[in-house]
Amino acid sequence: MDHSKQQNASITQAQAEEAVRTLLRWAGEDPTREGLLDTPRRVVEAYGDWFSGYREDPHDYLQRTFEEISGYDEMIVLRNITYESHCEHHMAPIIGKVHVGYLPNGKVVGISKLARVVESYARRFQIQEKMTAQIAACIQETLSPRGVGVVIEGAHACMTTRGIHKRGVSMVTSKMLGTFREDARTRAEFLQFIEVGTNVMDL
């Protein structure tokens, strides 16, 4: 079941703010001191922004398509769509770039809509592998193209700021559907277009 547009109405703003105060006390802080008085409210408001993807259905962004494309049937690629997400294991930031390509099957979509699909999935608790598959599936299910390719690069704070503390490491994941999966030449053309390898730490 898709819970993307559902909100947990049983949890109030006040309860969410109290949860932040509990974490502050657990960390050894005093949430009543001046510098932290507004922190619970600010954190809850930030969460509303960071996780706004739960209130959206990414498929909706791809409903309006264009068929007057003068017979264009070659690959369409968007490179370097920046994103910010959060690891579902540690709630730590993931920052990176998404590259999306598809082979139209008689209709195309406005390029900004593909970026909105990326944003909608990124603004949730994620693992990069799942987000890669979700974006590809959304495009395939809604546009029915001849093929879809999605490559994501990400720098994971759960690896760079805790645990093993390895900075400068980026993770690359891919999902190929249709012709992108079945035809090596199509896949190679897509990978050549996107030129994976830009250091995401420069974002």
Swiss-Prot record:
Q: Which Gene3D superfamilies match?
A: 1.10.286.10, 3.30.1130.10
Query: Which SUPFAM superfamilies does the record match to this protein?
Result: Tetrahydrobiopterin biosynthesis enzymes-like
Named in its record, the pathway it takes part in is: Cofactor biosynthesis; 7,8-dihydroneopterin triphosphate biosynthesis; 7,8-dihydroneopterin triphosphate from GTP: step 1/1
Q: Which EC numbers does the record give?
A: 3.5.4.16
Spell out the reaction equation it catalyses.
GTP + H2O = 7,8-dihydroneopterin 3'-triphosphate + formate + H(+)
Q: Which UniProt keywords apply?
A: GTP-binding, Hydrolase, Metal-binding, Nucleotide-binding, One-carbon metabolism, Zinc
Gene Ontology cellular component terms for the protein in this record: cytoplasm
The answer, when asked if Coiled coil is one of the entry's keywords, is no
Top-level division of the source organism's lineage? Bacteria
Q: Where does this protein hold Zn(2+)?
A: 87, 90, 158
The enzyme class is hydrolase
Q: How does it assemble?
A: Homomer.
The entry assigns this protein to a family as follows: Belongs to the GTP cyclohydrolase I family.
Q: Name the chain's protein.
A: GTP cyclohydrolase 1
Q: Which organism is it from?
A: Xylella fastidiosa (strain M12)
